[in-house]
């Protein structure tokens, strides 16, 4: 789970 777009 990245903390930006996706």
Swiss-Prot record:
The keyword Ribosomal protein is assigned to this record: no
Tissue expression summary: Expressed by the skin glands.
Subcellular locations according to the entry: Secreted
One cellular component (GO) term of this entry: extracellular region
Keywords: Amidation, Amphibian defense peptide, Bradykinin receptor impairing toxin, G-protein coupled receptor impairing toxin, Secreted, Toxin, Vasoactive, Vasodilator
Positions bearing Leucine amide: 6
Gene Ontology MF, one: toxin activity
GO BP terms, alphabetized: defense response; vasodilation
Keyword Secreted found: yes
Main location: secreted
Annotated family: Belongs to the bradykinin-related peptide family.
Stated role: Vasodilator. May target bradykinin receptors (BDKRB).
Descriptive protein name: Bradykinin-related peptide Pnor-3
Organism in which the protein naturally occurs: Pithecopus nordestinus
